[in-house]
Amino acid sequence: MKIKSKIVLVTGGANGIGKALCERFAAEGAEKIYVADIDFENAEKVAESVNGKAFRLDVSDEANCRLVVEEILSEAGRIDFIASNAGIGGAEGSLEVSNEVWQKIYEINVLSHVYLARAAFPSMIANGAGAFMITSSAAGLLTHPTAAPYVVTKHGAVALAESFSIEFHGQGIYVSCLCPQGVKTDLILGAENPNSFLMPEAISAEECADAVVSALEKEVFLILPHAEVGDYIVKKAENRDRWLHSLRKMRAAVLNSKNI
C-alpha cells in the first residue's frame, strides 16, 4: 500500500512517532492527513505543517473516536488508512498500580483501537479497501523488565491486531502492527526515566516513520523498525526460562540504577 493520494488519520499525531508519521506521509503525497490528539495545540501545529486538519481526540472515549471518524467521512468521503498510534506509558508495579490506572492504560493502549475500528471498518468494507495500523511496542512481543500495565496492554494490542488481520483481511482491510523498541521520544528520554536503558539502541521517530512506509508498501503485518527484535523473538521462543532470567537481571539493574 502506498500512501500517495490516500486519506489518512493519525492518532497521537501531535508528538513523537505520530508527528513523524504525519510528516513522512505528507512527503509521500497523502491527499489529506487528519491529525488527532488529546494535545490539540500541538496537533494543530502538525496539521498546519502538513496542510492537514487537527482534531482534539481522547482515544479512551468511544464517542469521541466515532465523532472524529464520522466528521472525516463527511468531509473527505472515505478514510484509506488509520495509524492508530496513540498510547500511554505505564506505572511500574503490577500490584501497586490502582485499578483505575490499570483501566485507563487498557482503554488507551487496547480499547482505543477497537473504538476506531468499530467506527471506521464499515466504510472501509463498503469501499472494498482500507488499512489500519496499530502501534504496539517491542514490549508487546518480548515483555519488559518494568511497567507491567504497559507490557500487558501492549501484548493485548499485538493480539488485537492479529485478530483484526484474521477477521477482516478477507473483507479488504490490510492490518499491520508497529512494534518499535527504543525510539527517541518522551517515553525514554531523560536519565531518570525507567526506560532510559533503551537509549543506546534507540532510533529517531523519523527513522521509525521510514520503516513504517517501507513496510506498508510491502503490506507486511509485523513492522519492526529494530531488526534485532526479530532475533529476540526467536530467542524468547527457543528458551522462555532463559529469556525470563535475563529480564529479571535487567530489572534488578534498572532498579538499582534508580536506587529503588
Question: What residue ranges belong to the model's regions?
Answer:
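The beta1-alpha1 cofactor-binding region of Rossmann-like NAD(H)/NADP(H)-dependent oxidoreductases
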Residues: 40-41, 57-67, 99
